[in-house]
């Protein structure tokens, strides 16, 4: 990605090549579609946060006509997520595609929110980890700032709804399961997934990779809500204990990666204590005919004192002649100003 000098005072940011059109983008390889989407949304985000200009991309498909083929559903969704309240101005000139950004579309840094591709700030919603949008993130951080942090356990008023008792029962069952020192293969367990409980089977040789993929959002979501339990080695459909084999991932290796992942999660504090993320990881033996055959990884995450991010917010701006990512401190300052 680079700035193009075309002899005009308008800033033009070159996003490289792109395949356009609803049908054409559907037939692309997923990796290529995601990479193109990322390049152009990154450029758009940077321009919106930095003033005005144009995003320029070379159209790869030669027969493309903007008015006839559209831009593509994935691009429309990504653009709306960055700038939900205003329509964007798309133009085609020969084999080039332009997105025009005017000052009126750029946030007022004194009162507005920074254009953001992903907040990377998660909460638990039911049995899922859900990313907060900008409004939810701002409210969440504002509440923590006003209170000077979060209490170690949620107040009853923080847990509204008729499902409170059931959630508490599920959490008690998960807590009892966490305390076990030995499990039996194929035995059923009695709790479902919930706001405070998630489990995965991951019966694959790529166990470590899969765990590393889900840990940031799951751990941060638990920490930002009321804490919770993550179990690796439980079958979601049959609700039975399956475990994982040590040959696919040694427990010590998995524990080390979990520790590394949690230590790397970005946090922001509004409290004096500035504590670290509190958690406990253990491995429970799974027995078959009296012999240890597999393991279940059990992770308990405590409610965090302030806010935990799955990764730094993905929000870009123009600085020193290039596209730079906001630091978490810069992003929070803009969001809460």
Swiss-Prot record:
GO CC terms: cytoplasm; nucleus
Subcellular location: Cytoplasm; Nucleus
Annotated InterPro entries: Poxin-SLFN/SLFN_N, Schlafen, Schlafen_AlbA_2_dom, Schlafen_AlbA_2_dom_sf
Region (Disordered) residue spans: 147-166
Alphabetized UniProt keyword annotations: Adaptive immunity, Cytoplasm, Immunity, Nucleus
Biological source species: Mus musculus
Domain of life: Eukaryota
Protein name: Schlafen family member 1
Biological role stated in the UniProt entry: Protein expressed in resting T-cells, which is required for maintaining T-cells in the quiescent state. Acts by promoting cell-cycle arrest of T-cells through inhibiting the expression of cyclin-D1 (CCND1).
Family stated for the protein in its record: Belongs to the Schlafen family.
Entry's Gene Ontology BP terms: adaptive immune response; negative regulation of cell population proliferation; negative regulation of G1/S transition of mitotic cell cycle; negative regulation of T cell proliferation; negative regulation of transcription by RNA polymerase II; regulation of cell cycle; T cell proliferation
Segments of skewed composition (Basic and acidic residues): 156-166
One protein family per Pfam: B3R
Subunit structure: Interacts with DNAJB6; promoting nuclear translocation and ability to promote cell-cycle arrest.
